[in-house]
From Swiss-Prot:
Name used for this protein in its record: 2,4-dinitrotoluene dioxygenase system, small oxygenase component
GO molecular function annotations of the record: dioxygenase activity
Keywords: Aromatic hydrocarbons catabolism, Dioxygenase, Oxidoreductase
PANTHER family: 3-PHENYLPROPIONATE_CINNAMIC ACID DIOXYGENASE SUBUNIT BETA (PTHR41534:SF2), BLR3401 PROTEIN (PTHR41534)
UniProt keyword annotation of Ion transport present: no
Short name of one Pfam family: Ring_hydroxyl_B
Annotated InterPro entries: NTF2-like_dom_sf (IPR032710), Rng_hydr_dOase-bsu (IPR000391)
Keyword check for Ligase: no
Superkingdom field: Bacteria
Function, as annotated: Component of the 2,4-dinitrotoluene dioxygenase (DNTDO) multicomponent enzyme system which catalyzes the incorporation of both atoms of molecular oxygen into 2,4-dinitrotoluene (DNT) to form 4-methyl-5-nitrocatechol (MNC) and nitrite. The beta subunit seems to have a structural role in the holoenzyme. Also able to convert naphthalene to cis-(1R,2S)-dihydroxy-1,2-dihydronaphthalene.
Gene: dntAd
GO biological process: 3-phenylpropionate catabolic process
């Protein structure tokens, strides 16, 4: 099944290519394996086991990027600005600094403790044709963050990941590209891992 972007003008070439990759390369066993993997990752992040997440899920060569795209219509644009801005553009060391900041007892952000609930949906997975140890994974994420009785935030995002099979049978995240749909976040902060 192919998407004709000339006829379906609202579909970007990138989205059409990704849809084709997952539609053609569908593998039920791989789908189940990746769904289980993402569920375990979400559980680690929900219970705030950030060091375990870094150790067991994240590869040292990670590229972790969260962007926000321009959501205004073309007629509303006055200037030729970039369509996307980085919210986060991090490597392993930068993620490690964020994790250590979360562990700091002086960090007011964790008092009272925050509760997270992640819903990972619409998971699709495909093996890379040129590098069979590499997996392409696309998913949607809903993240609920609650702190105190009246401070609740909900985040929605689409994630495009690359996971790599490593020696010893594990799988680690080497690239995460998160498309966060709010240009100006309506939350208190984005001190979260998506």
């Amino acid at each position: 099944m192919m998407i004709n972007t000339q006829e379906d003008k609202l579909v970007s070439a990138h989205d059409a290519e990704e849809f084709h990759r997952f539609f053609v390369g569908h593998d039920s066993d791989l789908q189940q394996e990746v769904t289980t993997l993402l569920t375990r990752e979400a559980d680690l992040l929900d219970i705030q086991a950030y060091k375990a997440w870094l150790e067991h899920c994240v590869a040292p060569e990670i590229k972790y990027q969260v962007i926000s795209r321009e959501l205004r219509s073309t007629s509303e644009r006055r200037y030729q600005l970039n369509d996307a801005v980085n919210i986060y553009n991090e490597n392993y060391q930068q993620l490690k600094v964020r994790v250590e900041h979360q562990m700091d007892p002086q960090n007011w952000y964790n008092s009272p403790k925050i509760r997270f609930t992640r819903f990972v949906t619409n998971v699709t997975a495909a093996k890379d044709k040129s590098a069979p140890e590499m997996l392409h994974v696309r998913s949607n994420l809903i993240l609920h963050r609650a702190r105190r009785g009246n401070q609740v935030d909900v985040f929605y995002a689409t994630r495009e990941d690359k996971w790599k099979r490593i020696e010893g049978g594990g799988i680690k995240l080497v690239e995460r590209f998160v498309d966060y749909p709010e240009r100006s976040p309506q939350t208190h902060n984005l001190m979260i891992f998506l």
